[in-house]
């Protein structure tokens, strides 16, 4: 392609989808998106391993729930449900007509005389755009472990973010490297089918109560009576995450954390940076002590 557009956006994950929603509502139509994957979803397009789920409650994580009239099925939605939701967003707001998939932007060149960007892609495109916006995120490229001898390993190997479902793990001896958020989700699922499972870790994980559950019909009926229920919930979650006092926590577990934050923020004078860091570390230590006590008991 060698044509022009007013706005060119790189990325079709949640950032790109939400940007299109905002631009469309603001009256912008001459917009084009470039996405290196084969569909929308961003990190949820690339990551499709067994057990994948969001570790933020779905009622706060999913954008535009009111506009979509959608209620997540679980408190912590699976990655597959999130991917399907991204597709529904794209279909509802006409995103697919605006996006070039399997297209990677390799470089952009500002042309001063024409006051526009020349955008070069891996498919030979040289498009012009008045504005270029990066919405490509950080979680789409696998970080491969540098392990001596991997190049001569004769068995099957792959990264979780590029899960190979053509490899049948049933009754196999499997090793998984790492115990971060991904492994915590993968290990319980593949342990159900493999013959032997070896988990290699550098640092043990600290895992708190997940409290996974289905969304109840009573909750859905209540939310239907509350305009902007998801926006309000998201605002409360943001306050909790930033360490600010929230008027109402989203659940009992977070309520305990909020009370702890509130206690630590009660002071009669402005704190120095060092004092604030000390109080934040103290709060974090108390939360981690709760987790450690749960593990030992």
Question: Can you annotate each of these PLM segments?
Answer:
Residues 18, 22, 189:
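Active-site signature of alpha/beta-hydrolase-fold catalytic machinery across serine-
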Residues 173-194:
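Rossmann-like NAD(P)H-binding beta-loop-alpha module
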Residues 16, 139-140, 183:
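Glycine-rich nucleotide phosphate-binding loop and flanking beta-alpha elements
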Residues 1-7, 12, 21-150, 166, ...:
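N-terminal FAD-binding dinucleotide-binding subdomain shared by FAD-dependent oxidases/monooxygenases
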Residues 99-100, 155-158:
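Conserved beta-strand scaffold positions in the cores of enzyme catalytic domains, especially
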Residues 160-162:
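Active-site glycine-rich loop that binds ribose-phosphate moieties when present
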Residues 11-17, 179-180:
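Glycine-rich Rossmann-fold phosphate-binding loop(s) that bind the pyrophosphate
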């Amino acid at each position: 392609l060698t044509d022009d557009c007013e706005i060119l956006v790189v990325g079709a994950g949640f950032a790109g989808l939400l940007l299109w929603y905002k631009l469309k509502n603001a009256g912008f139509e001459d917009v084009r998106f470039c996405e290196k994957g084969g569909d929308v979803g961003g990190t949820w397009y690339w990551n499709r391993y067994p057990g994948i789920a969001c570790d933020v409650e779905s009622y706060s994580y999913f954008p535009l729930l009111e506009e979509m009239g959608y209620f997540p099925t679980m408190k912590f939605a699976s990655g597959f449900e999130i991917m399907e939701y991204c597709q529904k967003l794209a279909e509802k707001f006409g995103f697919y007509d605006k996006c070039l998939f399997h297209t990677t932007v390799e470089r952009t060149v500002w042309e001063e005389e024409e006051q526009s960007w020349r955008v070069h892609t891996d498919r030979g495109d040289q498009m012009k755009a008045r504005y270029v916006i990066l919405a490509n995120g950080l979680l789409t490229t696998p970080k491969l472990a540098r392990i001596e001898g991997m190049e001569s390993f004769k068995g099957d190997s792959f990264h979780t973010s590029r899960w190979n479902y053509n490899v049948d793990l049933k009754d196999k001896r499997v090793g998984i490297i790492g115990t971060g958020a991904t492994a915590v989700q993968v290990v319980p699922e593949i342990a159900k089918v493999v013959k032997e499972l070896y988990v290699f870790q550098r640092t043990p994980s600290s895992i708190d109560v997940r409290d996974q559950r289905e969304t109840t019909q009573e909750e859905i009926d209540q939310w239907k009576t509350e305009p902007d229920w998801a926006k309000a919930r998201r605002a409360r979650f943001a306050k909790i995450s930033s360490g600010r006092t929230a008027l109402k926590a989203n659940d009992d577990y977070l309520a305990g954390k909020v009370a702890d934050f509130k206690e630590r923020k009660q002071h009669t004078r402005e704190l120095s940076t060092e004092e604030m860091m000390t109080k934040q570390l103290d709060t974090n230590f108390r939360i981690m002590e709760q987790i450690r006590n749960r593990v030992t008991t």
